[in-house]
Amino acid sequence: MPDGSEAAVIKVLGSIDEVDADQWDACAGTNDPFICHAFLKSLEDSGSVAPDTGWTPRHLILEDETGNLAACAPVYQKSHSYGEYVFDWAWADAYARAGGRYYPKLLCAVPFTPVGGKRLLIRPDLPEGSQRELKSTLVSGMVALAERSGFSSLHINFTNVDDGKICGG
């Protein structure tokens, strides 16, 4: 995968505990405490992020051919819009009036934290071209998960400009 020739293995995790903390943090970097493994783990361990609170972890990871983490993203299945700091209640209402079901939806974000930053986390030692390709693969994986699971939509909240461009924004 570092040269772009190997296939990435995408996995969906039900808990941040399913990924090695050091490997996650290697992708997350050290500049943003809200995307580090320990912070996301504390949200799960405290019960703040759990299915019964409307935040079901669905983290995406991409492993290289040796099983090492190359990319990851904090992703959640949401049954409401609380804790997102994006006020889409009117969207949900309009969706329902049109006969649709807005929830569950898929959200790539940091729970309860309206702080901008990267959401598509890539190992920094990979070449720039591979990093962009992996970010696109993460987004494609989220879209596929949303479609396969019957989610109404995919949201990526408070991302940085570079990640926004990958998403088409």
Label every PLM stretch briefly.
Residues 1-169:
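N-acyltransferase acceptor-side catalytic subdomain
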